[in-house]
């Protein structure tokens, strides 16, 4: 039996999370055939909303093989990451992708596995497919995700969360972990192991925490920059959260809220991180 996999693509998607999946499932077919199994274990199709080609976030075009609405015989539907750089882009981006979200919502009664990687997990959250379930997402959006979707249990450090009909994976190339997991689940652990070896993919990753980057080094927010400069200039002294708050002209509670919003960490953790 051939497992039909729909690879969703849309304008602004992360191109590798479409093409790399097609490559990995193609390799799975080759290895399956070479080891006495089916040469057509997986069939992948690139699907867009209207069946027309789209442009990925890297500027390259992705041809479409069919429209999402015309594909009724899928076993798996895989949503790629969205090419965004900041939390402030979310509302506009999600509004543009509303037709896709509505289509995902309509998929809820179908007996298929739906997956999403990285920032694409927000599309599943918007669709309602994750309501009452556990999920993971890219590390830099985990706090925003939890704030937006309190009815979803965020597992921020996990590379992959499988709830049965819905699977989410973490940041960046976690789509490779996701593909290997599907091969393991739908074919065999042995085939997944061989694919991981052949493609030189670490199939044993369980946490994305080692890959996270402290946001104050990436953010250009004036408050965080001013705070970092002050802390670095006072590393030889005992620095308190209250002293930092005074320097920034606000109360400690306000500072705490601002840091959680901007840097996804407490002021105390911010200070300790710079000291290290």
Model regions: which residues?
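Conserved Rossmann-fold dehydrogenase catalytic segment
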Residues: 154-167, 194, 198-201, 209-214
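HhH-family (HhH-GPD) DNA N-glycosylase catalytic core used in base-excision repair
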Residues: 143-146, 151-153, 200-204, 213-217
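Extended, subdomain-level signal for the structured scaffold at the beginning of enzyme domains
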Residues: 1-114, 123-125, 184, 193, ...
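Conserved anion/nucleotide-ligand pocket segment
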Residues: 162-198
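Structural detector of well-ordered beta-strand residues that form the stable sheet scaffold
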Residues: 114-115, 136, 155, 167
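A conserved active-site-flanking secondary-structure segment within enzyme catalytic domains
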Residues: 131-158
């Amino acid at each position: 039996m051939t497992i039909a996999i729909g690879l969703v693509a849309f304008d602004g998607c992360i191109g590798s999370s479409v093409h790399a999946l097609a490559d990995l499932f193609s390799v799975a077919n080759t290895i399956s055939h070479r080891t006495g199994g089916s040469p057509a274990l997986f069939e992948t199709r690139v699907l867009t909303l209207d069946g027309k080609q789209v442009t990925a976030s890297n500027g390259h075009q992705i041809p479409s093989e069919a429209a999402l609405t015309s594909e009724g015989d899928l076993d798996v539907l895989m949503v790629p990451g969205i090419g965004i750089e900041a939390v402030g882009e979310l509302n506009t981006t999600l509004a543009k992708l509303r037709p896709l979200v509505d289509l995902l919502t309509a998929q809820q009664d179908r007996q298929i596995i739906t997956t999403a990687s990285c920032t694409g997990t927000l599309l599943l959250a918007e669709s309602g497919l994750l309501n009452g379930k556990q999920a993971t997402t890219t590390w830099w959006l985990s706090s925003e995700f939890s704030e937006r979707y309190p009815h979803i249990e965020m597992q921020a450090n996990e590379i992959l969360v499988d709830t049965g009909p819905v699977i989410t994976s973490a940041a960046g190339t976690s789509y490779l972990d996701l593909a290997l997991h599907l091969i393991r689940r739908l074919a065999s652990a042995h085939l997944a192991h061989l694919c991981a070896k052949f493609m030189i993919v670490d199939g044993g990753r369980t946490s994305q925490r080692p890959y996270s980057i402290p946001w104050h080094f990436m953010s250009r927010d004036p408050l965080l920059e001013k705070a970092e400069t002050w802390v670095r200039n006072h590393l030889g002294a005992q620095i308190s959260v209250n002293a930092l708050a005074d320097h920034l002209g606000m109360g400690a509670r306000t500072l705490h809220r601002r840091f959680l919003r901007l840097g996804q960490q407490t002021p105390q953790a911010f200070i300790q991180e710079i000291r290290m």
